[in-house]
Regions:
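A short, mixed-charge helix-start or loop-turn motif at secondary-structure junctions
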Residues: 3-7, 83-91, 127, 131-135
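Helix-adjacent hinge/juxtasegments
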Residues: 71-117
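Extreme N-terminal tail/first-helix region
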Residues: 2-15, 192-193
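A short coil-to-beta-strand element that immediately follows conserved catalytic motifs
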Residues: 113-120, 163-165
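Long amphipathic alpha-helical segments
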Residues: 114-118, 158, 185-193
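Charged/polar, low-hydrophobicity segments characteristic of intrinsically disordered regions
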Residues: 81-100, 174-195
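Short, contiguous alpha-helical
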Residues: 11-26, 30-80, 124-188
């Protein structure tokens, strides 16, 4: 089934994000705690810190997106998303929260249409409120997630846990490779591709 609109593409990207996070966090969940927190070569020095960064930034932008799409004022207390900088010490606890924010992003994207994609989304920054079109905010968020998941993937290569394949989401002939994980997430090929 083809992508039918930009809104549909954003929805599929949100589903891809949830699936990729699920697959990556499942692999990271096989690490010992020592490996999870071990210092490595990357932008953030540990798998733990990188995964926490993905999560806190997701909280920040998904909150801004939900508020902007509903017409609510921007959140003035955005520091709460980053204090503490690493809210979770274990992969298990982090995975639960990541799955919850991934579901929020899927739900927000499922409600998109062309008009909502054009909406200005106010984002609270330290310097004040900045506004981004929903399309640009989503593009940035998806890119941010991919960028840092790639760093975790590379760090996993230095452990005994094999880094998972993260590019088996969009091609129809690879549906069988993701079916079980989509079911675990409450998603299906039919729902994703006929939105």
């Amino acid at each position: 089934m083809p992508l039918t609109s930009l809104a549909h593409h954003c929805y599929t990207m949100a589903c891809n994000n949830a699936w990729s996070n699920h697959r990556l966090l499942t692999a990271c969940g096989k690490l010992s705690q020592a490996d999870f927190v071990a210092t490595r070569t990357s932008f953030f020095p540990t798998i733990k810190s990188t995964l926490n960064h993905i999560l806190t930034v997701d909280w920040y932008y998904v909150d801004a997106l939900e508020r902007g799409l509903s017409g609510a004022e921007p959140n003035r207390e955005v520091d709460r998303f980053f204090d503490p900088e690493e809210p979770f010490d274990t992969c298990t606890a982090l995975a639960v929260e990541q799955r919850a924010v991934d579901r929020r992003l899927i739900n927000a994207c499922a409600a998109l249409d062309d008009a909502k994609l054009a909406l200005p989304i106010p984002v609270m920054r330290r310097a004040g409120v900045q506004t981004e079109a929903a399309t640009r905010l989503l593009a940035h968020l998806f890119q941010h997630q991919i960028h840092h998941r790639g760093q975790v993937h590379a760090m996993l290569a230095g452990t005994s846990v094999k880094p998972p394949q993260l590019d088996e989401f969009f091609c129809a002939n690879e549906a069988h490779l993701r079916a079980a994980e989509l079911a675990e997430l409450g998603l299906s090929e039919a729902r994703i591709w006929t939105n």
